[in-house]
């Protein structure tokens, strides 16, 4: 894979073969995810930076957020790639082989092990695995995403993984968005409390996210200093060489 590189203003361009011509690495990566080959991963090959996210709702949201924050994704040649919450590590490995910068944001999933009274820190461990840090042991007692906030686990993990461009939701996109932009969203959805707004958005996610974004478009810039915007700003800095 040969890539034409240039600085942020498009000058001082040069060509390089990523990973010294990493056909073996790319081949191995594609073999692992051959069942989901599509135009989306192909798009990432020609990007200056890639933002890996969960699904369609995140694609809609981050396109809208970037526009509200005056971040021109096309000019910066940044791609938003949905991995459907499954293949973050595989995508990351391919992008690393191509020497294409990336960041990611994933849900803080908690899952119960089948047939056992144990709970897996699925979201946390997904992140820790990607950055090469020892994963959490399963919990012997029932836990929730909110428990990882109150007991400090989310903060501790985030401080480590954010350095590598890996970001963990406090819960998920819908919950985090309502918590960061509560007043605007409650008014837009005509809901009385955050929980009812969250539950509404978690059903028919992409459809309702699209409708919501139209209603809160003028308020999205208020997310500029929150956790939702951090991975986007992180990738922009990398692409600009800052």
Regions found by a protein language model. Give the residues of each.
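Acidic, divalent-metal-binding catalytic cores of TOPRIM
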Residues: 1-242
